[in-house]
């Protein structure tokens, strides 16, 4: 009994340490990125190609930083059998056709999400997805998918559910509560994202959504000046 309690205690400590590190990572990178945002705004000049690249990089860096934090805490620090694989995406409305697209992403292979290939020929690819449903939710309620096995979860290509087992779709809102997109995290572990852990994921994801919201607003300002970003 003592041994069992000790094992449980160690497991609880490891879980709490992991949650703390995951939470801390978001605010650490947010503070670091603020100076980059300030620099971009100060140098704002519609049509500047370097600014265009900078705004896109801000989106991708937010996804990469979140992915790296999750991979470190739930991948590198655990055994191979306990390793959880993640994919992070920023979904938003395209500046070209106003349909939902994936503007930035991060995953183990560094490849664009497979569904984007179909998006080129079918702008309505993401209609009916969790992000699409969140766009129609005035309350901007985060969506937790404990298991993608349910028939209500839209599969974007054959076999997607065999790779994506659980997801969280978090609203990216601006200072006026306007929806600028969603921060989506998928993983290959059933039951990883649940409504019961909403507070943990709110604290974890919000710093990254703030970075994405500001980057999206900057992208819109560029578009108003006649400069289109590639999404």
Residue ranges and their predicted role:
Residues 92-162:
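Regulatory sensory and allosteric helical modules in signal-transduction proteins
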Residues 83, 163-165:
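Short solvent-exposed loop/turn micro-motifs enriched in small/polar/acidic residues
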Residues 179-231:
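Juxtadomain coupling helices with adjacent low-complexity linkers
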Residues 92-94, 106, 174-176, 187-189:
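Short, flexible loop/turn elements at secondary-structure junctions
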Residues 84-88, 113, 181:
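Residue-level recognition of the N-termini of beta-strands and the immediately preceding loop/turn
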Residues 4-104, 227-231:
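Intrinsically disordered, low-complexity terminal regulatory regions
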Residues 165-174:
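A short, aliphatic-rich beta-strand micro-motif
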């Amino acid at each position: 009994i003592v041994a069992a309690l000790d094992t449980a205690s160690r497991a609880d400590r490891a879980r709490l340490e992991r949650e703390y590190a995951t939470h801390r990572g978001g605010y650490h990178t947010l503070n670091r990125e603020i100076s980059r945002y300030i620099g971009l705004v100060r140098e704002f000049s519609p049509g500047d190609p370097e600014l265009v690249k900078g705004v896109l990089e801000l989106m991708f860096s937010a996804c990469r930083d979140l992915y790296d934090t999750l991979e470190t805490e739930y991948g590198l620090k655990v055994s191979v059998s306990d390793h959880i694989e993640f994919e992070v995406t920023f979904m938003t409305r395209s500046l070209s056709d106003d349909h939902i697209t994936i503007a930035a992403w991060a995953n183990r292979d560094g490849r664009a999400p497979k569904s984007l290939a179909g998006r080129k020929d079918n702008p309505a690819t993401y209609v009916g997805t969790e992000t699409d449903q969140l766009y129609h939710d005035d309350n901007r309620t985060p969506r937790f998918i404990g298991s993608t096995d349910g028939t209500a979860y839209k599969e974007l290509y054959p076999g997607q559910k065999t790779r994506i087992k659980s997801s969280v779709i978090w609203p990216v809102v601006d200072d006026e509560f306007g929806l600028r997109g969603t921060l989506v995290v998928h993983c290959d572990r059933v039951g990883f994202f649940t409504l019961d852990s909403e507070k943990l994921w709110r604290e974890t994801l919000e710093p990254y959504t703030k970075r994405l919201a500001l980057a999206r607003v900057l992208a819109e300002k560029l578009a108003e000046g006649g400069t289109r970003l590639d999404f």
